[in-house]
């Protein structure tokens, strides 16, 4: 039986690309035509985020690493990734693929030793990003804590980044208040889950 390269296996399928394409920014009408296919660049971004490799180690088949990074950084500043996520989440809810029984939990991402030297005066910061870049020193060293609200069907409804030393309990209400799932047509977005599950780390809240 032939094997499939792991990286290729996780690339977007034709059906997934057809679903994603209408949500992307329209192509530029001026300037030189795009040399590298947008689909390859998007797959390059997804590969890097999935495996956590340095940008320079993104496989060449996706395009030049700097071009993949440029797409990621540009769309990050423009809020494109957030809009894509919100649109896909709304579509999943309208199709009945969200149960609204959620779990709240957190995880630590350890930072590289050089991360403590990140600039605090960058003008290319994403809207709302704090000066500390959600980087703090806990017992295990420098890191970032991700607080997430996960639907029973494994869909991420909201997440919040804090410095690694921050506790779980104080962030429970803030991350739950970040839930926002748009509805098709008019009407307010849905923000309240039916049931919330959490471990003992949140019992004091």
Give residue spans per PLM region.
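Short alpha-helical elements
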Residues: 1-205
